[in-house]
């Protein structure tokens, strides 16, 4: 009697799933208006998490720390003491 010793090999490599390959969507934070730019009341000036920049004159702070203009005017980014920054909106004299 004839004995055959056959061994079969996988025709496809086993594929493992990766735990990488995804990233969160960007939040589009940062300055939305430049220094010296004219803005209308309600315009968003700066989107941030926490108070990286503080609200100055005629600028409000939203629930998510977004800074917005309260009046029509010109944007001015300023220093507030040694290590803090603020953004203000000044009315334009007509």
From Swiss-Prot:
Disruption phenotype: Essential, it cannot be disrupted. Keywords: Ribonucleoprotein, Ribosomal protein. It comes from the Bacteria. GO terms for cellular component: cytosolic large ribosomal subunit. InterPro entries: Ribosomal_bL27, Ribosomal_bL27_CS. One of its GO terms (biological process) is translation. Residues 1-9 form a propeptide. GO terms for molecular function: structural constituent of ribosome. The N-terminus is cleaved by ribosomal processing protease Prp. Uncleaved protein can be incorporated into pre-50S ribosome subunits. Cleavage of the N-terminus of bL27 is essential for growth; it cannot be replaced by a 'pre-cleaved' or non-cleavable form. Part of the 50S ribosomal subunit. A mutant Prp protease unable to cleave bL27 copurifies with its substrate. Belongs to the bacterial ribosomal protein bL27 family. NCBIfam families: L27 (TIGR00062). This is Large ribosomal subunit protein bL27. The gene is rpmA.
């Amino acid at each position: 009697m004839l004995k055959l010793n056959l061994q079969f090999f996988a025709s496809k490599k086993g594929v493992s799933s990766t735990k990488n390959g995804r990233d969160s969507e960007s939040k589009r934070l940062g300055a939305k208006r430049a220094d010296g730019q004219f803005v209308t009341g309600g315009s968003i000036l700066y989107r941030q998490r926490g108070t990286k920049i503080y609200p100055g004159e005629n600028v409000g702070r939203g629930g998510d720390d977004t800074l917005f203009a309260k009046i029509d005017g010109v944007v001015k980014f300023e220093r507030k003491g040694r290590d803090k920054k603020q953004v203000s909106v000044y009315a334009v004299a007509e």
